[in-house]
């Protein structure tokens, strides 16, 4: 734990790498990648605010989350890696605290406002409709979610947030705040970062080939904030690049962390 955020560490030597998960995720989503990188690095898995074992907030705020992550880094600059929502947190942390971030990897997200109508509204509605008071088992929860969320892998991802405490089931994540603040999470705090300088360090921008989160017309905005950016597309991967192509992500990250061109 540091500044209230829950963390797990893999590896005991080498430079530091901090991994930030996406919406509805937890640090442990990156465990496979962390274990592979831990042969040469100290890897920190973070549960972001309102997720996993980290504290809840009253409203989701990208700048506040970025400040909390920067506090983890302290006086030793680290490589910061973030996926989706965690990628936006990582980008803002690098812009607001450039002295704390040695290099940055942004996975399948851009510093832009995304349109309404994403699948996450459906996820939130289905999770809110689940009657936790009468729920008996996790398998029952899976069955009840299946009409609204047909993909078993997505249900399994969401249900990792379901915890049993005694006889009572509860969501470990802050479902109400995350659901109410989806517009904020889809957004980009342009006004809040407008006065900040571009990040001077190297940046790796990883896109999933089958994902539409990174578009060609996002490049100019990305280059405005991160002039040393290099883009890599992972073939066959959708939005959850690190889960779908972990070996490729590990190799790309190893090269980037070693200072080599990952292009």
Where are these regions (language model features)?
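Catalytic active-site module of serine/aspartate enzymes centered on a nucleophile-bearing elbow/loop
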Residues: 227-263
């Amino acid at each position: 734990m540091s500044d209230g955020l829950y963390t797990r560490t893999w590896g005991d030597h080498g430079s530091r790498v901090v991994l930030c998960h996406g919406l509805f995720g937890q640090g442990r989503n990156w465990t496979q990648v962390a274990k592979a990188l831990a042969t040469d690095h100290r890897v920190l898995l973070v549960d972001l605010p309102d997720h996993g074992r980290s504290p809840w907030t009253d409203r989701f705020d990208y700048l506040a989350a970025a400040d909390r992550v920067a506090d983890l880094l302290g006086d030793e600059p680290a490589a910061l890696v973030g996926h989706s929502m965690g990628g936006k947190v990582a980008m803002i942390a690098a812009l607001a605290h450039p002295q704390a971030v040695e290099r940055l990897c942004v996975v399948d997200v851009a510093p832009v406002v995304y349109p309404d109508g994403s699948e996450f509204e459906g996820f939130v509605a289905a999770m809110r409709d689940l009657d936790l008071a009468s729920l008996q088992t996790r398998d029952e929860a899976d069955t009840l979610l299946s009409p609204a969320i047909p993909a078993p892998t997505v249900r399994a991802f969401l249900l990792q947030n379901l915890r049993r405490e005694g006889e009572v089931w509860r969501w470990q994540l802050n479902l109400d705040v995350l659901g109410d603040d989806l517009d904020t999470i889809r957004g980009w705090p342009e006004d809040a970062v407008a006065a900040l300088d571009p990040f001077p360090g190297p940046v790796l921008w990883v896109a999933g080939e089958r994902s539409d989160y990174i578009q060609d017309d996002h490049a100019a905005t990305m280059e405005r904030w991160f002039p040393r950016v290099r883009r890599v597309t992972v073939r066959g991967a959708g939005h959850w690049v690190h889960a779908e192509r972990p070996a490729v992500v590990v190799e790309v990250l190893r090269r980037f962390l070693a200072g080599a061109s990952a292009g």
